[in-house]
């Protein structure tokens, strides 16, 4: 139904208008009594081979929702009901900001890709805190992707402010230093700058742990796919030196190699199918560089169970999707979940953790 009816209708709309319509509809469904439970019956059945415990939380599926789709955390119950094993909200900044001028989101259907230059549009950390506080009992871990406001000169203070505001509603923090749409942000990936920033964030999580006596959420960092190999290695090492607890590989790319659609010249970060191979190779690099010391989360061009499995075998403990959800529809997480179980069975692997890094 999605491909035949809903997708053609949505693709007649401006990409951002369709985005808002979809998220608002899911937010409404999240508030309907009984709807999430009913939708959950349509998702893939639980599979103990895919269940993992990471950072003290249970992940019933390794397939999560990447940041950017539900920036303000308004539809977490709906995304959980669709079968995602975790949901990453944001990117959130301390203060609300409108982001860049529209149009700023573009579909490239022949390339199964998106280009965005959103610019961290969001309602701010206080609003997100209120939204997540109202969730009640959660069925999946909720990660919070944090960034800096566009006009902030001292970046660390914004990341620390997000931790202070959201500490008790986040199951994990993701430090976003790799969006190409905030001036100067990617410079924070340089080894020394990244290590200093992550130390500031980790110091704040420790301070909050002591203040609240609540277990500190893990801190992960999200890296870009456009770094030179030596710079990527230095960034990974800087993150490890700081004590980060996970890596997300990778964010959107500035590359336009192989694109055919007219929108290929639009400024912004490219996501979707063109990143499949590149991001998988970077997951493998990250796994080798860390020697499996911290979990790696693979994201970029995952359209099927085969794509997800390739990233897992390259070294990803978890994977995330976003652009493919736009093209494949709400049944995608359940299809990937079922397919991963079949692939493990095919390869005679008893649990997904035993597949992590098998090809690294």
Curated annotation (Swiss-Prot):
Substrate binds at residues 71, 116-120, 176, 181, 251-252. The keyword Nuclease does not apply. Pfam families: DHO_dh (PF01180). The active site is at residue 179. GO terms for molecular function: dihydroorotate dehydrogenase (quinone) activity. Its main location: membrane. It comes from the Bacteria. One of its GO terms (biological process) is 'de novo' UMP biosynthetic process. Its EC number is 1.3.5.2. It is a peripheral membrane protein. One of its GO terms (cellular component) is cytoplasm. FMN binds at residues 67-71, 91, 145, 176, 222, 250, 272, 301, 322-323. The keyword Cell membrane applies. It catalyses: (S)-dihydroorotate + a quinone = orotate + a quinol. Disulfide bonds: none annotated. Pathway: Pyrimidine metabolism; UMP biosynthesis via de novo pathway; orotate from (S)-dihydroorotate (quinone route): step 1/1. It is found in: Cell membrane. Catalyzes the conversion of dihydroorotate to orotate with quinone as electron acceptor. PANTHER family: DIHYDROOROTATE DEHYDROGENASE (QUINONE), MITOCHONDRIAL (PTHR48109:SF4), DIHYDROOROTATE DEHYDROGENASE (QUINONE), MITOCHONDRIAL-RELATED (PTHR48109). Belongs to the dihydroorotate dehydrogenase family. Type 2 subfamily. Monomer. NCBIfam families: PRK05286.1-2, PRK05286.2-5, pyrD_sub2. This is Dihydroorotate dehydrogenase (quinone). It comes from Deinococcus deserti (strain DSM 17065 / CIP 109153 / LMG 22923 / VCD115). The lineage of its organism: Bacteria, Thermotogati, Deinococcota, Deinococci, Deinococcales. The gene is pyrD.
């Amino acid at each position: 139904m999605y491909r035949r009816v809903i997708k053609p209708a949505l693709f007649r709309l401006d990409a951002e208008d369709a985005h808002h319509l979809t998220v608002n509809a899911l937010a409404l469904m999240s508030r309907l009594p009984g709807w999430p439970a009913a939708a959950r019956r349509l998702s893939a059945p639980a599979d103990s081979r895919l269940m993992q415990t990471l950072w003290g939380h249970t992940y019933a599926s390794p397939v999560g929702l990447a940041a950017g789709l539900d920036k303000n955390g308004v539809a977490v119950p709906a995304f959980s009901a669709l079968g995602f094993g975790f949901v990453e909200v944001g990117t959130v900044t301390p203060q609300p900001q409108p982001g860049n001028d529209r149009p700023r989101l573009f579909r490239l259907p022949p390339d199964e890709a998106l280009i965005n230059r959103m610019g961290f549009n969001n309602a701010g950390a206080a609003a997100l805190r209120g939204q997540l506080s109202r969730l009640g009992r959660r069925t999946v871990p909720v990660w919070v992707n944090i960034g800096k406001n566009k006009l902030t000169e001292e970046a660390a203070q914004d990341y620390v402010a997000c931790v202070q505001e959201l500490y008790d509603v986040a199951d994990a923090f993701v430090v976003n230093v790799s969006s190409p749409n905030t001036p100067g942000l990617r410079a924070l990936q340089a080894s020394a700058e990244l290590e200093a920033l992550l130390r500031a964030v980790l110091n704040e999580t420790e301070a909050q742990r002591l203040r609240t006596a609540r277990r500190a959420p893990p801190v992960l960092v999200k890296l870009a796919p456009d770094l030179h190999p030596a710079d990527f290695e230095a960034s990974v090492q800087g993150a490890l030196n700081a004590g980060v607890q996970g890596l997300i590989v990778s964010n959107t790319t500035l590359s336009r190699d192989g694109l055919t659609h007219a929108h290929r010249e639009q400024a912004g970060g490219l996501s979707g199918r063109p990143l499949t191979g590149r991001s998988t190779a970077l997951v493998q690099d990250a796994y080798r560089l860390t020697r499996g010391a911290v979990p790696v989360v693979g994201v970029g061009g995952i359209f099927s169970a085969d794509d997800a499995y390739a990233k897992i075998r390259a070294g990803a403990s978890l994977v995330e999707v976003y652009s493919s959800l736009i093209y494949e529809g709400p049944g995608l997480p359940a299809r990937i979940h079922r397919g991963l179980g079949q692939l493990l069975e095919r390869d005679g692997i008893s649990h997904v953790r035993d597949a992590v890094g098998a090809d690294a």
